[in-house]
Amino acid sequence: MAGFKRGYDGKIAGLYDLDKTLGRGHFAVVKLARHVFTGEKVAVKVIDKTKLDTLATGHLFQEVRCMKLVQHPNIVRLYEVIDTQTKLYLILELGDGGDMFDYIMKHEEGLNEDLAKKYFAQIVHAISYCHKLHVVHRDLKPENVVFFEKQGLVKLTDFGFSNKFQPGKKLTTSCGSLAYSAPEILLGDEYDAPAVDIWSLGVILFMLVCGQPPFQEANDSETLTMIMDCKYTVPPRVSAGCRDLITRMLQRDPKRRASLEEIESHPWLQGVDPSPATKYNIPLVSYKNLSEEEHNSIIQRMVLGDIADRDAIVEALETNRYNHITATYFLLAERILREKQEKEIQTRSASPSNIKAQFRQSWPTKIDVPQDLEDDLTATPLSHATVPQSPARAGDSVLNGHRSKGLCDPAKKDELPELAGPALSTVPPASLKPAASGRKCLFRVEEDEEEDEEDKKPVSLSTQVVLRRKPSVTNRLTSRKSAPVLNQIFEEGESDDEFDMDENLPPKLSRLKMNIASPGTVHKRYHRRKSQGRGSSCSSSETSDDDSESRRRLDKDSGLAYSWHRRDSSEGPPGSEGDGGGQSKPSGGGGVDKASPGEQGTGGSGQGGSGGTPSGTAGSSRRCAGPDSSSSSPASAAPRGAELVQSLKLVSLCLGSQLHGAKYILDPQKALLSSVKVQERSTWKMCISAPGPGPSADLDPVRTKKLRNNVLQLPLCEKTISVNIQRSRKEGLLCASSPASCCHVI
């Protein structure tokens, strides 16, 4: 203890930082302090021993002994005792809600009985615990009951007049406060220890429900007279049960007063938890309440913090010391328990409405697909392409208010083919029907203009395979209306500096999920996007009629061909060079012209771009091929709409091929489709158009089906490709009805 015996100079031996004063007494002052090692706030009762006489000194050490003895969740905990030559420091648990007297004074007519019952039951529970240990408080009053708002508890404090008693043996010391003291103490007679606390409990309950003390007159003499005569008036608003309990406790004759057992079993106190504190272990009354892992973790932190070695810590705990070692241990332990309790409360209090609010805030930029939604999808996702489920979105209630149309009618699920292993069998277009309107949709923007067009009848489409990827963090300022909905690949955690990686290592593809979307749902998405617009360079009046006609021909044959163009990460922004030539490349690079096929603009840098299209009339940036656009390639018969499935599955083929060390995405010797231009591995762009007849129409169906199945069996690698999907020249199958509806996926 030699290290602790320093004078008071704002700090206690460097162990506590003292702050403002919380209260003062005759011989003591209570200060707010911070435990230096743990950072926890505590209350420090500083007692000046030079002002104490022999009797007061005896009471002081009696208080310390009693507080060491009583360790209860409804009693303020004593952490440490620091004794110096002139002062005694008691390190106590800090209450955050003030005392009960101030709380009662804020309610002139008292608390409602339900709340009063809750607090009074906790006080009775604490006093009952003390009496079982043969400790009498002798100074029960609202000023010595402290609120702990974060824990929802009240706790007893100030055991300065407490003492040990033996059952059947009376005490003689007169102590306490006049307005709350029992008549026998004021008379100076011998008294039964538990009975004086029962009287004080009656006064506290009266104040809780009435808002004022039962015995309070103009002066102490009149107050003493009222106490001796036991005269008080209970307001008529107090219930009969509460009135009866008060009367049972405020009895002039101690032998007629109710015992603690009778109080606890009184009808008015039934139906209330006597101590909610028993549900938690804060404050921790024993180190044995901790798990072995938590116990060892705390000891390890103390050893590393040079508080003491392991043997000294264990010895201090086992001998129930009240020194800095045990104080540090219990403060650390209570922090762990408090954090655990807060997590449990947050988990229980997480309501669906709160989850919805968080979901809406993140809607415009990041669209998460909870794992629970897999049952609502018409295709079983690949085992390696899952999305981790967030606890905030674990419930089905997350979807309420955000989805109103479905991907698949549950009644139609039985019509889907069985999936065996990782392979996905080809689903014929006729096997899927438009989604039912009552089913919830996976992605839907809640906007009024979208709701107005939901009554449009969907047109049957072929089955489409959709790859979704979360958006890059660099695109978080994208407006809601321009947020991608379908046929897109999103990436989570993508940053701009990832594109500076080696060309053989494209940016990391974090998570992919393959699902089959309902044709009706797809059609509705594109129809709504027509009304929203996407900042296009094509007016909606130019193509609206043709687009409507193309939607009516969706079930007819469509010409599809597949062309692949290399696109480097250094590619410039749209319209950076050329006369409205759209997306361009620096001189010498493989530029790609994004003008429409019919109005080919200056592609990239013109003569410098090895991959650019021949220059022609200047076109607008990001132009789409309209139905009336002319084409240099003759149109002819093409594969059915089901070939659209194959086109998107080629994306998986490219992903799978990234696993191999070959230089090319597709082996030139084994390419099945002559329309697939073999390029070196890099970031890729896919265009679906109908420039002319494709030899894919003559492919062997068996080989084609085998190719599809093999594509879906290829595992996805940790790399990515960039896919740009453009609609066909005549059909507009992948686009909205508005002219500038290219689905740019970067």
From Swiss-Prot:
<keyword id="KW-0460">Magnesium</keyword>
<dbReference type="InterPro" id="IPR008271">
    <property type="entry name" value="Ser/Thr_kinase_AS"/>
</dbReference>
<feature type="domain" description="UBA">
    <location>
        <begin position="291"/>
        <end position="334"/>
    </location>
</feature>
<feature type="compositionally biased region" description="Gly residues">
    <location>
        <begin position="600"/>
        <end position="614"/>
    </location>
</feature>
<keyword id="KW-0418">Kinase</keyword>
<feature type="modified residue" description="Phosphoserine">
    <location>
        <position position="482"/>
    </location>
</feature>
<dbReference type="GO" id="GO:0004674">
    <property type="term" value="F:protein serine/threonine kinase activity"/>
</dbReference>
<keyword id="KW-0547">Nucleotide-binding</keyword>
<feature type="modified residue" description="Omega-N-methylarginine">
    <location>
        <position position="534"/>
    </location>
</feature>
<feature type="domain" description="Protein kinase">
    <location>
        <begin position="16"/>
        <end position="269"/>
    </location>
</feature>
<feature type="modified residue" description="Phosphoserine">
    <location>
        <position position="390"/>
    </location>
</feature>
<keyword id="KW-0808">Transferase</keyword>
<dbReference type="GO" id="GO:0005634">
    <property type="term" value="C:nucleus"/>
</dbReference>
<dbReference type="InterPro" id="IPR015940">
    <property type="entry name" value="UBA"/>
</dbReference>
<feature type="modified residue" description="Phosphothreonine; by LKB1">
    <location>
        <position position="173"/>
    </location>
</feature>
<feature type="modified residue" description="Phosphoserine">
    <location>
        <position position="518"/>
    </location>
</feature>
<dbReference type="GO" id="GO:0006468">
    <property type="term" value="P:protein phosphorylation"/>
</dbReference>
<keyword id="KW-0597">Phosphoprotein</keyword>
<feature type="modified residue" description="Phosphoserine">
    <location>
        <position position="362"/>
    </location>
</feature>
<dbReference type="GO" id="GO:0106310">
    <property type="term" value="F:protein serine kinase activity"/>
</dbReference>
<feature type="region of interest" description="Disordered">
    <location>
        <begin position="494"/>
        <end position="638"/>
    </location>
</feature>
<dbReference type="GO" id="GO:0005524">
    <property type="term" value="F:ATP binding"/>
</dbReference>
<comment type="similarity">
    <text>Belongs to the protein kinase superfamily. CAMK Ser/Thr protein kinase family.</text>
</comment>
<keyword id="KW-0479">Metal-binding</keyword>
<dbReference type="GO" id="GO:0043523">
    <property type="term" value="P:regulation of neuron apoptotic process"/>
</dbReference>
<feature type="modified residue" description="Phosphoserine">
    <location>
        <position position="162"/>
    </location>
</feature>
<feature type="active site" description="Proton acceptor">
    <location>
        <position position="139"/>
    </location>
</feature>
<keyword id="KW-0539">Nucleus</keyword>
<dbReference type="InterPro" id="IPR011009">
    <property type="entry name" value="Kinase-like_dom_sf"/>
</dbReference>
<dbReference type="InterPro" id="IPR017441">
    <property type="entry name" value="Protein_kinase_ATP_BS"/>
</dbReference>
<feature type="compositionally biased region" description="Basic and acidic residues">
    <location>
        <begin position="549"/>
        <end position="558"/>
    </location>
</feature>
<feature type="compositionally biased region" description="Low complexity">
    <location>
        <begin position="615"/>
        <end position="638"/>
    </location>
</feature>
<protein>
    <recommendedName>
        <fullName>SNF-related serine/threonine-protein kinase</fullName>
        <ecNumber>2.7.11.1</ecNumber>
    </recommendedName>
</protein>
<feature type="modified residue" description="Phosphoserine">
    <location>
        <position position="495"/>
    </location>
</feature>
<dbReference type="InterPro" id="IPR000719">
    <property type="entry name" value="Prot_kinase_dom"/>
</dbReference>
<feature type="binding site">
    <location>
        <begin position="22"/>
        <end position="30"/>
    </location>
    <ligand>
        <name>ATP</name>
    </ligand>
</feature>
<feature type="compositionally biased region" description="Low complexity">
    <location>
        <begin position="533"/>
        <end position="542"/>
    </location>
</feature>
<feature type="compositionally biased region" description="Gly residues">
    <location>
        <begin position="575"/>
        <end position="592"/>
    </location>
</feature>
<feature type="compositionally biased region" description="Basic residues">
    <location>
        <begin position="522"/>
        <end position="532"/>
    </location>
</feature>
<keyword id="KW-0488">Methylation</keyword>
<comment type="function">
    <text>May play a role in hematopoietic cell proliferation or differentiation. Potential mediator of neuronal apoptosis.</text>
</comment>
<feature type="region of interest" description="Disordered">
    <location>
        <begin position="383"/>
        <end position="414"/>
    </location>
</feature>
